[in-house]
């Protein structure tokens, strides 16, 4: 059995740096464990696979948020936190048949090609996806802008091949609208462009002289702390926003402040059990400032923060160790301490590690506790999978007919699906399936069943949207009525 010399050095360094007080050399022990795994495991495993498995086990067992990710997985994480990337614009999950599309992004190459939520990807350019992880399939789909990839798709109606031209996918994590004298703002997550998108919404809100904001943070999993802080600085009055407290002396504790004097905004914030992490930082800052109330359910309670560290390959670790006589395993150590910028080929993947926790303005630590709402009310339900709060009322005054394309078509399909008239996946094109659903809706509402969206049909659809919200989203309606009462 081949000795795993460089793996021993790398993993031994990791272990001894974590538990130096024990005064023990775990290198030989770990080397024996790796050799045992390679020898006894029923599938062949090369040195790099063994190392990655060891790192995944080492960091993945620390807590639910820490772990090791190879370069493909790292790319997926980075894409999810960026405002734009080159790809097709679809989120994937593993399923029995292969990999399933769980979300097609609006106005993306995937949507334009006709891909739908729920499509099962059986093959990429003729290569089966069976047994593969979503990250591996995503890597196969990814490519240069302007090139094409052919996906073999399984639907209930049968199998088909769909060619998709890769392109720039821009994800806007902020959506908003005006309802009378209230601005509704939904923040999906805190990606690299969240604060910029939020500022664009605030510019228009300020231009209209609106000071009442219904902020929807439900199901927001968090993201970049800096982005959540940047949003808070636009609406939370001066004072502490949050404090990050780290154990390691290599990371400096940090306090974030707002210098906004005399904030004019009255805030109602919608939260639920999936409001987490950076979203809780924003919600906690609003609650502690006294400028807003939380409405809904207790939040998730993720009060710890993670840092991402790029990890060297064993070869790079040995190369730089020999050259400099130093033994750092992460790129940030080489850059911070020695000014050495590593090549991408030197990197094995990333370690995401829980490094500290945060406190709210009033000193609350919410890890495992969450934020209790000021007004507790049942969370929304999603009729036929539709989030009613995210539907915009129809505004297009022109009659929409077969093959019409645009946002109003998508909003109408969402209303029709929530109301049980439409079984398809809402998109931006009116096809025969859309028109058939409209005819059913028109007939039940005593409107001429043309299948087109005229003024009368538009008004009835908007009325149905209001009725659906009243039935299925009490938190939204409570927040709206509360703000309108002032």
Residue ranges and their predicted role:
Residues 1-23:
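Sec-dependent N-terminal signal peptides of Gram-positive bacterial secreted proteins and lipoproteins
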Residues 25, 106-119, 172-173, 408, ...:
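PDZ/PDZ-like domain micro-motif
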Residues 40-100, 148-164, 173, 473-477, ...:
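Extended, small/polar residue-biased N-terminal targeting/export presequences
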Residues 109-120, 142-144, 285, 418, ...:
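A short glycine-leucine-enriched loop at secondary-structure breakpoints
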Residues 110-132, 213-216, 437-447:
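Conserved PDZ fold ligand-binding element
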Residues 122-210, 253, 367-398, 465, ...:
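C-terminal, low-ordered peptide segments at domain boundaries
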Residues 207-214, 220-385:
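Conserved acidic, small-residue-rich alpha-beta core segments centered on
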Residues 399-465:
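Short acidic, glycine/serine/threonine-rich helix-capping segments at coil-helix boundaries
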